[in-house]
From Swiss-Prot:
Primary role: Transfers an acetyl group from acetyl-CoA to L-homoserine, forming acetyl-L-homoserine.
Main location: cytoplasm
InterPro entries, A to Z: Class_I_gatase-like, HST_MetA, MetA_family
Family from the record: Belongs to the MetA family.
Residues of the active site: C142 (acyl-thioester intermediate), H235 (proton acceptor), E237
Binding site for substrate: K163, S192, R249
Catalytic activities: L-homoserine + acetyl-CoA = O-acetyl-L-homoserine + CoA
One cellular component term from this protein's GO annotations in UniProt: cytoplasm
GO biological process: L-methionine biosynthetic process from homoserine via O-succinyl-L-homoserine and cystathionine
Name of the gene encoding the protein in the UniProt record: metAA
Pathway: Amino-acid biosynthesis; L-methionine biosynthesis via de novo pathway; O-acetyl-L-homoserine from L-homoserine: step 1/1
Gene3D superfamilies linked to this entry: 3.40.50.880
Residues at the site labelled Important for acyl-CoA specificity: E111
Organism whose genome encodes this protein: Rhizobium rhizogenes (strain K84 / ATCC BAA-868)
Protein name as catalogued: Homoserine O-acetyltransferase
Amino acid sequence: MPIKIPDTLPAFEALQNEGVRVMTETMAIRQDIRPLQIGLLNLMPNKIKTEVQMARLVGASPLQVEFSLVRVGGHKAKNTSEEHLLSFYQTWEEVKHRKFDGFIITGAPIELLEYEDVTYWDEMKQILDWTTTNVHSTLNVCWGAMAAIYHFHGVPKYTLKEKAFGVYRHQNLKPSSVYLNGFSDDFAVPVSRWTEVRRADIEKVPNLEILMESSEMGVCLVHEQACNRLYMFNHVEYDSTSLADEYFRDVHAGVPIKMPHNYFPHNDPEIPPQNRWRSHAHLFFGNWINELYQTTPYDLEDIGEERL
């Protein structure tokens, strides 16, 4: 069954053109089932591109999903029109009374700031605490993952000497994990960040389990079983051209940037890159959504009750 999003959302047409099944409100009502409620807290500047990336992966599930777009209230977006935000987004204040089966918190290009210097950090802390009681499973991505693991466990981030940028081989450290069901032992994942968290700090925290890691780029995915929380520090959701877009943006702006590692064929930026992570991205999101379906309470109001 497909993902339910407004048919006027730009992602609707984009996903239809890719063959991803999407449905309107009218179609969803005909199916007499409870759809999974999944929210997306979109912190990225280009919100439309991120909507498409996440909806593509969530919408590939055979389960019916109602996808809600959420934004922080105390921050004015510079790269997305106010009309788009008013049409398709709700602030967290407007949805905090709700319960969600799943909730995704994206990255944001603010990783070089101290957390406490982020303009919406106070609201971010409230949102993270809220996910403990109002969300069955939270998927935190890149900066969102670093912020969450710092907020809940004090795990620090470290600034890198140069940007971690490219497509790197990663290892499956826990083949028996439900989130890695069907994964190869070794697979490619896009990386784009100026900071990192370190294994030594994570290992100090009980109940945090490292599921994916790169010998070059370090920790990629951490699972916290007690609250069904996932920390994904890299970008399995990226489009084929996402790293190229970032590279050419910086080149044209005169910002020093190395060519992304293991990305352009023959290291030639004139040759379109090949996507070598798409299948594992779909597998990861499919496993996450399947685990939601298997373990979430049927009654939404029961979500989080055991954590109170």
